[in-house]
């Protein structure tokens, strides 16, 4: 009975490990597909697991998996980032803050401040944020619909004249304020920044590129903060599933970034407007049917 009992325990633990890896693989794919498309990764990372019966993975788990997306965007834009760092270094050395790359770096720094301050405020003064009604299904559904309508309006009236080399600190601040709204589940960080950029007159592809670059500091900081808490609770068996989620998120995120930039060269954002409206309506209908039963 001893060896048999040990084998049963080993089999059970292996089964649990594989199940955890599968869950994180799915979460990583969902994260990768939705982080950089303007459709809200937070909303999908809450809805999809609940849809398949896994429950809400929580803020910490999703923030850690987001590190895979950060790895992807850093690799994809490594040349841009190198140029920005070089521009900032030259600006500090020679005072050349009017150079495009230096202005881009300054805009990213300024644009990061609103979400950084808002995130700190939530962490310090809203301990019940993760379980609050703002993360509920009806809230996510309504927010998704509202953001779809705003993106539609921006697509309709935005002049689309600005290009990346014209970016200023003021642009970073405006888009950064929109990025801070992404702390509300369903808003979508890429969606809010893309919408604000289109309202502000950016060309679609440049708006997307700036959105991706602007997200690097914010998502990295959020992931690192939650990573500290996650590691405090992490067991040895939890390392592999976590890595599976991060790697799958990185791979799919890279594909999503590449696809979106190419797509926006020749297409509008109407497909995302339609998707977000449909997503919001379906989630709301699901919640209503669930509460009526």
UniProtKB/Swiss-Prot annotation:
One GO term describing the cellular component: plasma membrane
Entry EC no(s): 3.6.1.27
GO-annotated biological processes: cell wall organization; peptidoglycan biosynthetic process; regulation of cell shape; response to antibiotic
GO MF term list: undecaprenyl-diphosphatase activity
Keyword Transmembrane helix among UniProt keywords: yes
Transmembrane annotation, as ranges: 57-77, 106-126, 134-154, 172-192, 212-232, 239-259, 268-288
Disulfide bonds: none
Source taxon at top rank: Bacteria
Function, in words: Catalyzes the dephosphorylation of undecaprenyl diphosphate (UPP). Confers resistance to bacitracin.
Entry-linked HAMAP family: Undec_diphosphatase (MF_01006)
Protein name: Undecaprenyl-diphosphatase
Phylogenetic lineage: Bacteria, Bacillati, Cyanobacteriota, Cyanophyceae, Synechococcales
């Amino acid at each position: 009975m001893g060896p048999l009992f040990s084998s049963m325990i080993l089999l059970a633990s292996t089964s649990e490990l594989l199940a955890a890896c599968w869950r994180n693989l799915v979460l990583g794919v969902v994260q990768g597909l939705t982080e950089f498309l303007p459709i809200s990764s937070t909303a999908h990372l809450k809805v999809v697991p609940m849809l398949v019966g896994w429950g809400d993975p929580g803020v910490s788990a999703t923030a850690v998996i987001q590190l895979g997306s950060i790895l992807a965007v850093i690799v994809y834009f490594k040349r841009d980032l190198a140029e920005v760092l070089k521009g900032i270094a030259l600006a500090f050395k020679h005072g050349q803050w009017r150079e495009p790359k230096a202005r881009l770096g300054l805009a990213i720094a300024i644009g990061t401040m609103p979400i950084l301050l808002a995130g700190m405020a939530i962490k310090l003064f809203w301990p019940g944020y993760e379980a609050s009604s703002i993360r509920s299904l009806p809230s996510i559904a309504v927010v998704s619909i509202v953001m779809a309508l705003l993106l539609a309006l921006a697509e309709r009236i935005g002049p689309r004249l600005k290009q990346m080399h014209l970016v200023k600190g003021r642009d970073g601040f405006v888009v950064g304020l929109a990025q801070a709204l992404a702390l509300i589940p369903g808003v979508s960080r890429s969606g809010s920044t893309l919408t604000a950029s289109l309202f502000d007159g950016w060309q679609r592809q440049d708006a997307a590129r700036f959105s991706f670059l602007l997200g690097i500091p914010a998502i990295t900081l959020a992931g690192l903060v939650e990573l500290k808490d996650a590691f405090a609770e992490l067991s040895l068996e939890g390392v592999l599933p976590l890595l599976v989620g991060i790697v799958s998120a990185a791979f799919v995120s890279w594909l999503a970034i590449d696809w979106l930039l190419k797509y926006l060269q020749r297409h509008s954002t109407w497909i995302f407007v339609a998707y977000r409206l449909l997503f919001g309506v379906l989630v709301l209908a699901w919640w209503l049917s669930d509460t009526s039963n």
